Amino acid sequence: MNRFKSLLLITFFGISSLFAQNKGWNLDKSHSSVGFSIKHMVISEVSGRFKDFDINFTSTKSDFTDGKVEASIKVASITTDNERRDGHLKTDDFFNAEKFPEIKFVSTSFEKAGENKYKITGDLTIRDVTKSVTFDAAYNGSIKAPRGGEVHSWKATVSINRFDYGLKWNRAIEAGGLVAGDTVNITLNLELNKPAA
């Protein structure tokens, strides 16, 4: 009897695992990026990225309208290709990587906004401040993967005001404006692998 129960449990968890795997999409980090840009000295722009991040996407519909997204980003992985500036960004003037080690996003809606266009709304948390934001997302299509399954490509963008999240460092310049602008443009380029059914 115990052996029969064990077989039932193994079968149940095996089916459950397969079902979850078919719903879930695996992020290909080597072909994905989380980047940002911000005005510098009013007239130019500085860009950077986070090297350590994880994004979980699930959807069971072909039009993705039941899509759900959860993302976490390690603040300490920030890079702008300038060691001194990166160190400053990790301090309490900006992200305070020690006290607030992660940036998080959890979607609340995934709406179709045209052909291969979507509005992804959710809660973005930076420094324990949570605000609702809406990403403009473009679905770039899919292709069969050499080892089975499918590769899907997405691009999503959003702009936020850094002061809304306590990224408070501020220095004015003589010509007017700030050394670092208030608007941060965030761009995600994502490659997701959908396992074969």
Regions found by a protein language model. Give the residues of each.
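Low-complexity, acidic/polar, glycine-enriched regions of mature
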Residues: 21-197
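Bacterial Sec-dependent N-terminal signal peptides
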Residues: 1-23
